[in-house]
Curated annotation (Swiss-Prot):
Main location (coarse class): cytoplasm
Catalyzed reaction equations: 2-formamido-N(1)-(5-O-phospho-beta-D-ribosyl)acetamidine + ATP = 5-amino-1-(5-phospho-beta-D-ribosyl)imidazole + ADP + phosphate + H(+)
Taxonomic placement: Bacteria, Pseudomonadati, Pseudomonadota, Gammaproteobacteria, Enterobacterales
Full protein name: Phosphoribosylformylglycinamidine cyclo-ligase
Family membership: Belongs to the AIR synthase family.
Keywords from the named record: ATP-binding, Cytoplasm, Ligase, Nucleotide-binding, Purine biosynthesis
The encoding gene: purM
Gene3D superfamilies: PurM-like C-terminal domain, PurM-like, N-terminal domain
Cited PANTHER family: TRIFUNCTIONAL PURINE BIOSYNTHETIC PROTEIN ADENOSINE-3, TRIFUNCTIONAL PURINE BIOSYNTHETIC PROTEIN ADENOSINE-3-RELATED
Length: 345
């Protein structure tokens, strides 16, 4: 026998009791997201989910994402309640552009020291995002890793699986000359461009919490949760012939629209069809950012762009607006062999 101190996992910086307390805190809100296809509850080694029986040839669609350095801004401002919505939105919006209905979602939360209140706030936001998109939060991983993260700093990642009928996959192959492009308004910068946002804040020397923009703090504009378009877009897909959908994330207009365009087509965007929300004007002015760089980095007020036949454009816009979206004609598709896939004029 020796007189050495007996060490525990907690002595090493990992508090299993805190992790268990977190699970107890979130059980109720997670249960609210449950779908009928989900089998079992939290706590299993894996989550089980049956395929909805309405699909004849179901195709699974998967996606994973994070929220980038918007998370750093949220941590600096100690505002954790909506970052979970952002996390879900970035995943489910990527699924729905292919026509997929999100089925279930999992999250990964890693931190240097687990703060149960902060983690519960984030996961409550994740559950809210799942409710907005109709998918079940079936599980996740909370990793307390002392030495890997500074103090209570944390990172999050999300993973989502959806399903689409094989014959109804939206892949852009039907896009053709004369299609109309319909825009869906964003709620702000969503979850992209925040390294530039934070650089602009640093260079300009402003305090986002005390700087007023349109009657509310700049921080409110910058941390507005990413809009989730799933239910509106699925209703649209069921009503009109949608040819393609682009989710405007990293890379902005220049990189995301071409991802859904067939060869020998070009998207013409009418810059006069909408006004940038004030937060983008502030960012451009405060950072002296060029117009081209703005369209490359930010969504500039446009969260999604939908291509569909011109004859169905008015019906689509009316349906989307009835669902609470702000939709408008933003441009059209023309035949072109130009290497410039997107023109903003």
């Amino acid at each position: 026998m020796t007189d050495k101190t007996s060490l525990s996992y907690k002595d090493a910086g990992v508090d299993i009791d805190a992790g268990n307390a977190l699970v107890d805190r979130i059980k109720g809100v997670v249960k609210k997201t449950r779908r009928p296809e989900v089998m079992g509850g939290l706590g299993g080694f894996g989550a089980l989910c049956a395929l909805p029986q309405k699909y004849r040839e179901p195709v699974l669609v998967s996606g994973t994402d994070g929220v980038g350095t918007k998370l750093r801004l949220a941590m600096d401002l100690k505002r954790h309640d909506t970052i979970g919505i952002d996390l879900v939105a970035m995943c489910v919006n990527d699924l729905v552009v292919q026509g997929a209905e999100p089925l279930f979602f999992l999250d990964y939360y890693a931190t240097g020291k687990l703060d149960v209140d902060t983690a519960a706030s984030v996961i409550n936001g994740i559950a809210e995002g799942c409710l907005q998109s109709g998918c079940a939060l079936v599980g996740g991983e909370t990793a307390e890793m002392p030495g890997m993260y500074h103090g209570e700093d944390y990172d999050v990642a999300g993973f989502c699986v959806g399903v689409v009928e094989k014959s109804e996959i939206i892949d852009g192959s039907k896009v053709t000359d004369g299609d109309v492009l319909v825009a869906l308004a964003s709620s702000g910068p969503h979850s992209n461009g925040y390294s530039l946002v934070r650089k602009i804040i640093e260079v300009s020397g402003v305090d986002p919490q005390t700087t007023d923009l349109d009657g509310k703090p700049l921080a409110d504009h910058l941390l507005a949760p990413t809009r989730i378009y799933v239910k509106s877009v699925l209703d649209l897909i069921a009503s009109v012939d949608v040819h393609a959908i682009a989710h405007l994330t990293g890379g902005g207009f220049w990189e995301n629209i071409p991802r859904v365009l067939p060869d020998n087509t070009q998207a013409i965007i009418d810059e006069s069809s909408w006004q940038w929300p004030s937060v983008f004007n502030w960012l451009q002015t405060a950072g002296n950012v060029s117009q081209h760089e703005m369209y490359r980095t930010f969504n500039c007020g446009v969260g999604m762009i939908i291509a569909l036949p011109a004859a169905e454009a008015d019906k689509a816009i009316a349906l989307l607006n009835d669902k609470g979206e702000n939709a408008w004609k933003i441009g059209y598709i023309k035949a072109s062999d130009s290497e410039q896939r997107v023109v903003i004029a």
